[in-house]
Regions:
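Acidic, proline/glycine-rich low-complexity IDRs
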Residues: 1-46, 55-62, 71, 75-210
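Short, conserved beta-strand/beta-arch hydrophobic-aromatic motifs that form part
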Residues: 49
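Extended, charge-biased low-complexity segments
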Residues: 67-68
C-alpha cells in the first residue's frame, strides 16, 4: 500500500479524526479520545526489516505500521512512534550494508526490544519515566489483529520500497514503552515474564510516568 491507502486503512481502524504530523522521516496519524491518545505511522510499511512468514507453501513478505497509546498529549506517542520507526529503519540499512555476520537484523515483530527509544523521543527529558520499548501484538481490537494482504504482482509501493516477487501482509504493531525496571526484566527473564508481571501488578501501560 502507498501512504494514502495506508492512512485510509488506519483511519477505518481507529476512532475519531486524525491529525497528521511528520516525525523525522515518517508520517504519523494522531487520534485523541478524551484523555487518551493514539499515534500510528502510515508509511513505515515501506521499510523492509527482512521479516517473512510461511503460509503453507507460500512465502509472504510482512510489513507493519507502528502504533502507540498514552494518557498524554498525542505528540508524545507520536514522537515515540517516529523514534521506533527510525530505529528500525537504521537497523535495516545497517544490516543490508554489513560486510560481516556480526550485525544482527532487528525485525519489526512482536518481542523486538527497542533500547533507548524513549530517549530518542525526548520522553525522560519531559518527566516521563519510560525509557525503552518493546513491540507487541496490539490488543485494542480484541484477539483478532487486522491486516491487509496484497497478492504477488499487485503490491502497491512508493520509493524507495520495491514490490518484489512476494505477496505482502501489512499489520499494526504496538509499541509499548517501558521503564528501566520493566526493561531489565525483559532482557534478563524474557518478555513473557515481563508481561506476566505487568498483568499481575495491573500496570497501566498508558501511564508514561508510572
Amino acid at each position: 500500500m502507498n501512504t494514502a491507502e495506508t492512512a485510509h486503512w488506519i483511519n477505518r481502524l481507529l476512532p475519531g479524526q486524525p491529525e497528521f504530523h511528520q516525525v523525522g522521516a515518517f508520517k504519523v496519524a494522531g487520534y485523541t479520545i478524551d484523555d487518551e491518545s493514539i499515534a500510528c505511522s502510515v508509511d513505515f510499511g515501506r521499510v523492509n526489516t527482512g521479516l517473512v512468514t510461511e503460509a503453507g507453501a507460500e512465502t509472504v513478505d510482512v510489513r507493519s505500521e507502528i502504533l502507540s497509546l498514552a494518557r498524554a498529549d498525542v505528540s508524545v506517542p507520536g514522537r515515540a512512534v517516529g523514534a521506533a520507526a527510525t530505529m528500525l529503519l537504521d537497523a535495516s540499512l545497517s544490516f543490508k550494508s554489513a560486510t560481516d555476520s556480526s550485525v544482527t537484523p532487528m525485525h519489526a515483530q512482536p518481542g523486538q526490544i527497542l533500547p533507548c527509544v524513549g530517549i530518542m523521543a525526548n520522553l525522560p527529558q519531559e518527566g516521563f519515566s519510560v525509557v525503552h520499548g518493546i513491540l507487541a501484538d496490539p490488543r485494542i481490537w480484541g484477539p483478532e489483529i487486522p491486516y491487509v494482504r496484497e497478492e504477488a504482482g499487485q503490491v502497491n509501493v512508493e520509493a524507495p520500497d520495491e514490490a518484489g516477487d512476494l505477496a505482502r501482509l501489512t499489520l499494526p504493531l504496538q509499541l509499548i514503552l517501558l521503564t528501566e525496571e520493566e526493561f531489565a526484566i525483559a532482557l534478563n527473564e524474557g518478555s513473557d515474564v515481563m508481561f506476566e508481571r505487568m498483568a499481575e501488578q495491573e500496570v497501566d501501560l498508558l501511564d508514561l510516568k508510572r
